[in-house]
């Protein structure tokens, strides 16, 4: 698969997003581009108020594009805002091209419950219902299906309750990590 990135965003993050729609794809710098070859072209632009990402995705000779704009709100880090803009653009282009909307939205990595917990804590600090606000953000900003957003907030709530009871010599157990797009040879999750 050919991947083109223009803008200040990590290549690995963009690859993990591409793997949502192209599972098992390899990314080669030397691969020649042809009209039939799978490709994603991503452009990220920024100004003082926002980040705007545009994704053009090609598969089987067909092509779709989408863009997403995320405001710099002074609350989230610029890195998180950039990632949301890029994720939303790639997700929408892929959803249109393939006709599917993956239930986990743009959540990648092995600890999405950590994000849900951070969102809930932030909402509670502002006087909101933490779980409800976290679910709203997960479905709205991160494009997760409502049932997956609810599951994440439940996992986050349970993690938070357990963390207080586990001593410093405790450990975490992960069961079926659906978020990580790769299975590295050294990974203990496999």
Task: Please place each PLM-identified region on the residue numbering.
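Short, well-ordered secondary-structure micro-motifs within conserved domains or adaptor modules
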Residues: 1-2, 18-20, 24-79, 83-87
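Beta-sandwich/jelly-roll carbohydrate-recognition scaffolds of carbohydrate-active enzymes
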Residues: 6-9
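Conserved, surface-exposed functional patches that form binding/active-site neighborhoods
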Residues: 82-102
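N-terminal [4Fe-4S]-dependent radical SAM core
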Residues: 97-101, 121-122, 131-173
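Canonical Radical SAM [4Fe-4S] cluster-binding loop centered on the CxxxCxxC motif
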Residues: 168-190
